[in-house]
């Protein structure tokens, strides 16, 4: 399945979002610790990295996007994507611990903790916990899929992963992440599908899954094909709400900009 997206379509959708949101005031609360209630696990590095920012409108019942940055699980920092600002939604931008200071599954645990924090706190800001979307680019897309498909991570916090309204990974691994393979001494050209691969956790009852990649000829090698296989296997498993978008002419980094337009279009279903 190959969906080619056209700029004019997204310009129109962005304009409509902006029109709906132009009179709304937005607030930004920064560097909130999302694991400070876990003193037994706390250390200086956790205290430094396990923080989030929340950008939110002064309205009620809004959708929230939990956003995980990319960087190969070795680099990167939280940010509020410009294309998600002033769209009538909240954005929770998350920092998480990174290799080599930690190893798997520390960063997956952090991602789950941040999503759980959002479920438990978003009503205080006016958001609807039934309208929480999880998304991220590259490594962030991988974390998105892991916390949404392998239910054990959120279950640690008393949260059912099926309560996530939508999963929207941007160009994320669906096999075991290359950094996890590196930690095990496995070459990055050797694919692995084990418990740390989203593909291992395909299931019919998962939240709606919107897979987005760049052009297969310009993406990181194999990234489109991984996601296409994920799309197919979710269909075979009986999941009826998986979509796959391939953004024609965009590479791995460049695909994020038009992918935000896809995200905004998809989450309109939650209004």
Regions found by a protein language model. Name each.
Residues 119-182, 194:
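Primarily recognizes the serine-hydrolase "nucleophile elbow" in alpha/beta-hydrolase
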Residues 77-94:
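Short amphipathic alpha-helix adjacent to the substrate-entry channel of hydrolases
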Residues 1-24:
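Bacterial Sec-dependent N-terminal signal peptides
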Residues 61-71:
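Short beta-strand element of the alpha/beta-hydrolase
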Residues 158-180, 189-228, 232, 236:
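The feature captures the conserved acid-bearing segment of alpha/beta-hydrolase catalytic domains
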Residues 212, 228, 235-271:
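C-terminal catalytic histidine-bearing segment of alpha/beta-hydrolase fold enzymes
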